[in-house]
A protein has these predicted regions:
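N-terminal transmembrane-helix/juxtamembrane module of multi-pass inner/ER membrane proteins
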Residues: 1-63, 70, 77, 93-114, ...
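Membrane-embedded catalytic cores of phosphoryl/pyrophosphoryl-handling enzymes
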Residues: 2, 127-252
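Alpha-helical transmembrane segments of integral membrane proteins
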Residues: 6-11, 73-85, 181-185, 206-210
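Aromatic-anchored segments of alpha-helical transmembrane domains
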Residues: 16-23, 86-92, 188-201
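Residue-level signal for the membrane-embedded core of alpha-helical transmembrane segments
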Residues: 51-55, 87, 161, 165
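Cytoplasmic membrane-interface segments at the C-terminal ends of transmembrane helices
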Residues: 66-69, 229
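Alpha-helical transmembrane segments in multi-pass membrane proteins
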Residues: 81-85, 89, 93, 211, ...
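Low-complexity, proline/glycine-enriched hydrophobic segments characteristic of transmembrane helices
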Residues: 98-150
């Protein structure tokens, strides 16, 4: 358990660097940024936004099962553990949001520029939200629609919890099997999703940090359960020879 906690904690620390630096710098979100970079980050956000998040989870579940190659019964246990970790994170996020009820950055901006009180905003219809910013030409249409779709509270970030959980599951489950490229890609993807939430005006840096560490707790428990119920996460002895052969082929 301790080794798992150390491994996943290192992953959580790496994911925490970006939001922590933003928080310490005192940077504040303001609308008006646009361009292909922001649009790319929007598509990163969309990989988590429903319904695409379901497809992302299905693809990642299949990839994890292929990478670990457990037999049928352990594979089913692993599938259940991974899905439970992701779903538990989303339920935890929703429960905390209803308690804290922190407004999103763009909501406070609407309050200042359009005179919509923050406490009244969450009672408005989504179409009303889109009409409020219809005349703001410096805000892209796709961002207006995203704001209208995402009218929940900010703290903590559900998108971050989803992406960070999958990235940390990669650290916990796949790193011991030397699937380092997959882990690196998952970490980069999670960091891009997290960055998109700040730059799109959806979250504060602290929302990302808290979500990351909630994910760490859930994933650490999930990885420990997977090790107990599904078998060792390290490379099986019969695969060592295959790995050695692949490394020799690369050198030659």
């Amino acid at each position: 358990m301790l080794e798992i906690a150390k491994r996943t904690a290192l992953g959580a620390l790496l994911l925490s660097v970006m939001p922590l630096l933003i928080w310490l710098s005192g940077w504040q979100w303001q609308p008006g940024a646009s361009g292909p970079g922001l649009r790319f980050l929007f598509w990163m956000t969309e990989t988590v936004t429903r319904p695409w998040g379901i497809l992302t989870s299905a693809i990642l579940c299949a990839w994890f099962l292929w990478c670990l190659r457990f037999r049928l019964k352990p594979a089913l246990f692993l599938l259940a553990i991974m899905i439970t970790a992701i779903v538990a994170g989303q339920y935890t996020k929703s429960w905390i949001k209803t308690l804290v009820q922190e407004p999103r950055p763009y909501v406070l901006w609407l309050e200042k520029t359009h005179g919509v009180p923050g406490d009244r905003f969450y009672q408005l219809d989504r179409q009303v939200v889109e009409r409020l910013v219809a005349d703001d030409n410096h805000i892209p249409l796709w961002l207006k629609r995203h704001w209208a779709f995402e009218t929940g509270f900010a703290f903590p970030s559900g998108h971050t919890m989803f992406a960070a959980s999958w990235a940390l599951l990669g650290v916990g489950l796949l790193w011991p099997r030397r699937h380092r490229k997959t882990v690196a890609l998952l970490m980069i993807w999670a960091a891009a999703v997290m960055g998109s939430r700040v730059l799109l005006g959806m979250h504060w840096p602290r929302d990302l940090l808290v979500a990351t560490w909630i994910s760490w707790m859930l994933v650490t428990l999930a990885t420990w359960l997977a090790q107990r119920l599904c078998g060792p996460l390290t490379i099986p002895p019969d695969e060592h020879q295959e790995i050695a052969q692949r490394e020799e082929e690369k050198k030659s």
